From Swiss-Prot:
Residues engaged in binding FAD: 34, 42, 47, 87, 121, 286, 326
Keywords tagged on the record: FAD, Flavoprotein, NADP, Oxidoreductase
HAMAP family in alphabetical order: FENR2 (MF_01685)
The UniProt record lists the keyword Lipoprotein: no
Pfam annotation, one family: Pyr_redox_2
Oligomeric and partner information: Homodimer.
SUPFAM superfamilies in the cross-refs: FAD/NAD(P)-binding domain
Species of origin: Leuconostoc mesenteroides subsp. mesenteroides (strain ATCC 8293 / DSM 20343 / BCRC 11652 / CCM 1803 / JCM 6124 / NCDO 523 / NBRC 100496 / NCIMB 8023 / NCTC 12954 / NRRL B-1118 / 37Y)
Keyword Methyltransferase: no
Protein name: Ferredoxin--NADP reductase
GO molecular function annotations of the record: ferredoxin-NADP+ reductase activity; flavin adenine dinucleotide binding; NADP binding
Amino acid sequence: MTELYDVAIIGGGPVGMFTAFYAGLRDTKAVLVESLATLGGQVTSLYPEKKILDVAGFTGIKGSALIDSLDEQMKLFPIDIKTSTTVTNVTKTNDLFTVTINNGSSFQAKTIIITTGKGSFEPRKMQVSGVDQLVGQGIHYFVTNKHDFDNHDVAIAGGGDSAIDMATMLNEFTHSTRIIHRRDQFRAMEQSVKQLSQSSVIKETPKKVSQIEKQSDGKLKITLAQVKNDQVTNDICVDDLIINYGFISENKIVHGWDIQPENEGQAFSVDQAMQTTIPGVFAIGDASHYEGKADLIAVGFGEAPTAVNAAIRFFDPQRRGPGHSSSMVIQDGKLI
């Protein structure tokens, strides 16, 4: 018999995880589907060591610690979690949605909440000869353990939030840290730039990487040049180069489903209840778009209760609204 859920949450990043918890708090039968082998989305895959500063109640929480806490929170309820599972199609028949997954099986749901972010992601590559051959041999696009760089000479290429945060974080453990950016000004949050300016991180600006050579001692010789005229400015020798030019995202699989809500780029247009142009289908976090939207984890957390409560009103209009969580008691995965 086909499994029927009240809510199907598609996307197991931090916003999807909190949505699943809140769906449990509202005593719904929920399933959380994630294409990767582990939950946590980009936080787990890209910056588990990075401190996240804009989550309410924390002066800064490491990415992996945030995901661990969200996982513990979800365990309060019997949420059905499907990892290594890609949703290949979503169709609607009468009042139910049929969700087909990559093994060919399917289940049904009364409502859908899309929490896929901007979709799959891959790093923007550095367009310098020889870089691809040196990935894993001193050149990195991802950092999963900051202590891999203890006492190393490290350079970070990039000028956005992630590059600056990486530089200031690693600078506590490295022998030396440099940041290479094409402009004099960094494109990051003001406090992050201020923290960088007060640190001992060496700024190589405005410069670009023009050549990289692996030396006999294992170090990387990086030739830097002026951005405007390609004139060489200086060489630096480092153990590691971390390329942090951001990521390219696409929701190709989502945009291949039979149901197709209106979208704005990679995100779906939503109303004030976080509902898309298809009744019963909601989108939150980076997967949603409305005027003034800020793509932050904190914003997605706030949108989760709105979407879950709206979903409940959709499939059960007579159910009473949400109470205050401080008046609830959870025992053995149930609200009592």
